[in-house]
Amino acid sequence: MTRIDRRSFIAAGLATTAAGLLSAQPAAAAITPAAKASSMAPHWVARPRSESSAERARRWGRDTWTSLVAMTDRHTGLPADNIDASLAAADRSGYTSPTNIGGYLWSAVAAQQLRLISHGECSQRVRQTLNTLAKMDHHRSSGMFYNWYDESSGEVLTSWPGTGDRVYPFASSVDNGWLGAALMVVREAVPAAAKLAGQLYDRMRWDMFYDRDASRPGGLIHGGFYDAPPPPGSSTFTGNHIGIGPDVWYTNHHYDTTVSETRITSYLGIIAGQIPPRQYFAMWRTFPAGCDWSWQESQPAGVTRTYLGLDVFEGAYSYRGMHIVPGWGGSMFEELMPDVFVPEASWAPRSWGHNHPLHVRAQREHGMIEAGYGYWGFSPASDPFAGYREYGVDALGLNPDGYFSDREKTNYDPGFGDCRPATNPTPTYGDGVVTPHASFLAMMYEPTAAAANLTKIERELGAYGDGGFFDAVAVRSGTIARRYLSLDQAMIMGSLANVLGGNAMRRSFATRQVSRRLQPVIGMEQFGASAH
């Protein structure tokens, strides 16, 4: 069973992986806890200690928006994938993706809702980006965009900036999903851009990614497709699920777990009437509990229920007195990013309504109690020690190799009942790595605890610059990834718009039509998640 994380998979268009694509810039020297107070940057030492929690959160939003503006080309309205701490145009990454473009669009709406920019500026920015999108090369039969573009021109990348490595244009199901979600938000929230946003969205065929003949009854979503011969050695097959235009090269990889950011594509297909609702129940909650599946992280417990004619094993993992439906890696991003747009907890109170707050609690308890880091919030991010890495809480992931929470990749292994003995049920953790965007997502469920955690990250660790929170920080060494990632900053903006702006993202996305089509589907389910 081949599994590729979304953020790794979007790089599949490269013939070879370019080293250091998102290389972080560690601090010149590691900072010991005792030395932190004397080594804090002047920028954040000057922050007022008397500001209210709401004022502090709005300041965080304002500075985060500053980084997104700095990433965005003033001629095309396209954001770069990332930018260094300098926020200088010369330090932009030189490439962007549909996810990044979508993130900038919903961030502009969030900035307006938070009163950081005017209605007029929001409309101008959004329309500029949409006008560029309308001219960009894409897969015309499906309306889907390719994975990498030059943000300064909008041209499809065929060679990687800085290395010259060949790029094979690839249409990713989940990256187009985030662009689609953003277009839905814009269509509802920005009247001056509604027509163009609607035109771009309406041409997107989500069933292009839907494989009704996949291994799971109900069908699964492909990772994506190439519309020209793929890189040598790629695992693909040719076909065309919508029967329009030439055949494409589909990935043999599918997204088959529910607690994943990739469920946004299933949602959009169901909303559009292009993917049958039962596809939502084709994905695993956990894998089965038998010894044949003992390769997964731990042994789930649960019962089988039937929805829309499909039997679903409602498994959950046990962690610190909680029963939680795990993701693939145990990251906040997998659990909560779709919830920025779809009010999952209220629409599905017996499933997501249990799992979301339990996942947040589990991440907090892992960082503060089990690992003793003193900070929490674990999700894929820039690696403070160079590059990019998936971070998470290993115990909350199906993947036995984990998304680990520390630099040392400390592996939690509780065993699998009588099938596999435990090798490391009570680990000793090392230099934990937290990413602020995880705490902003968590703020939708634990606002006070998340804000307190972020305040400590800013004041005690100094992981803050002119563009808001730096992407990640190792809490014991004090090593900081001094860079801003477009997607992570956009998750911060979307979360703040919900927390401070009266669920602005959800209100714009979850229209009556969306509710009629999606809420009955996700609302019928009962997860195995619960607190003891």
Q: Where are the language model's segments positioned?
A:
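Ser/Thr/Asn(+Pro)-rich, low-complexity disordered segments
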Residues: 39-532
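Intrinsically disordered, low-complexity, compositionally biased regions/tails
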Residues: 16-17, 24, 147, 396
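Low-complexity, intrinsically disordered short peptide segments enriched in small/polar/basic residues
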Residues: 1, 7, 28-29, 42
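Short, polar/charged, Gly/Pro-enriched helix-capping and turn/loop motifs at alpha-helix termini
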Residues: 16, 23-24, 118, 506
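C-terminal region of N-terminal signal peptides and the immediate post-cleavage residues
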Residues: 21-38
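Residue-level marker of structural boundaries
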Residues: 18-19, 501
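N-terminal secretory signal peptides and thylakoid transit peptides that target proteins
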Residues: 1-17
